[in-house]
Curated annotation (Swiss-Prot):
Protein keywords: Amino-acid biosynthesis, ATP-binding, Cytoplasm, Glycosyltransferase, Histidine biosynthesis, Nucleotide-binding, Transferase
Organism encoding this protein: Trichormus variabilis (strain ATCC 29413 / PCC 7937) (Anabaena variabilis)
GO molecular function per UniProt: ATP binding; ATP phosphoribosyltransferase activity
Gene3D superfamilies xref list: Periplasmic binding protein-like II
Record's protein name: ATP phosphoribosyltransferase
Length: 218
């Protein structure tokens, strides 16, 4: 039996919708009263694990799940040893550098050397500024990183942006985009090579499902 790691949060609904289109029904995870973290599809073909987004690639890398669905931002940050199979074309967002709208900084290169940059995506932020050859101090924050510039603790932030509304409401503005992110289908490399549980067929069905679902997945 295949095991699928599903992310809690914004990607869950469309992940379940896509899996249901290929005959795997984990919609019980969407029930408001559900407290189960593991359920079996009614067909008996697969088991679903409901985990934090950051943990999806961990379960897949260690083989406790053969496949999983997670945002590219998490994959880029964590660099897990997993097979990247399909861009699922939903869950769009972008990784951006943002500063106070009232600041003089119009691009990252305007930031003074050794500025502080707050982010929960420490590796992505460090990689970006190293690429610019601009020395900055990355300040790890795991709550509302917008407070960094607001309180004066940091000159900038690196964070995921969907609509930009949160930035605007807190007086911040984007000055550049590091990369764009969508949901991705990943697999345990050995399980995929061995075609465990007829995994290749399922992946192909999901790939075809993405194409047919494109008009409604957002």
């Amino acid at each position: 039996m295949l095991t699928v790691a599903l992310p809690k949060g914004e990607l869950l609904k469309n992940s379940i919708r896509l899996l249901k289109s290929v005959g795997l029904d984990f919609s019980a995870f969407l029930d408001s009263g559900n407290r189960q973290l593991q359920i079996t599809d009614a067909s008996g073909r697969a088991k679903g694990l409901l985990v934090r987004g950051q943990d999806v690639p961990v379960y897949v890398e260690y083989g406790q799940a053969q496949i999983g669905i997670i945002g590219y931002d998490v994959l880029r940050e964590k660099q897990p040893q997993v097979a990247h199979l399909v861009d699922l074309q939903f869950g769009y967002c972008r990784m951006s550098v943002a500063v106070k709208a009232s600041s003089p900084y119009k691009s990252p290169l305007d930031l003074p050397a050794h500025s502080r940059v707050a982010s929960k995506y420490v590796n992505s932020a460090r990689e970006f500024f190293q690429g610019l050859d601009l020395p900055v101090e990355i300040v790890p924050l795991y709550g509302s990183v917008e407070l960094g510039p607001i309180t004066g603790m940091s000159e900038a932030i690196v964070d995921i942006v969907s609509t930009g509304r949160t930035l605007k409401e807190n007086g911040l503005v984007e000055i550049t985009t590091l990369y764009e992110s969508t949901a991705r289908l990943i697999a345990h490399p050995l399980s995929y090579r061995l075609n465990t549980g007829n995994l290749h067929q399922l992946v192909e069905q999901l790939r075809e499902g993405v194409l047919s679902e494109l008009p409604i997945l957002t």
